[in-house]
Swiss-Prot record:
This is Putative uncharacterized protein YJL086C. GO terms for cellular component: membrane. It comes from Saccharomyces cerevisiae (strain ATCC 204508 / S288c). It is found in: Membrane. Partially overlaps EXO70 and TRL1. Keywords: Membrane, Transmembrane, Transmembrane helix. It is a single-pass membrane protein. The chain crosses the membrane at residues 93-113.
Amino acid sequence: MSISAGISINAFDIIKPEHFNGPLLFTASTLRVHSPWFSNTFKHTVSVNYLYVPAGRPRTFPLIKFHYEFIPKKVYRRASNSFHSVENCFEQILRICIVFLSLKIYTLTLVIIKVFIRRSDA
């Protein structure tokens, strides 16, 4: 079975509703999967929350939302496992997506922390 997935970022929103005063806080990301069965399109939504407040300086609370859309381009089924081919397809693509999103979230976390630390030192 050969699977290739196309990845596109649909939206990037930063919301700053309130001011907080506290230490660095990173809340775990949430992964929501919308996958209509026997469909060739499904979406993943990832939400990551960050909070960085230097001592004595109130800062805003950025809520960062990423919306990733994964569309498999080609799916080849073999006659020997045609009964489980759709299920195997989704399992393979979900594994690829989860690894990709984990790396993206980890990298973004480091970048945001570095930016906030540089701004607070300036």
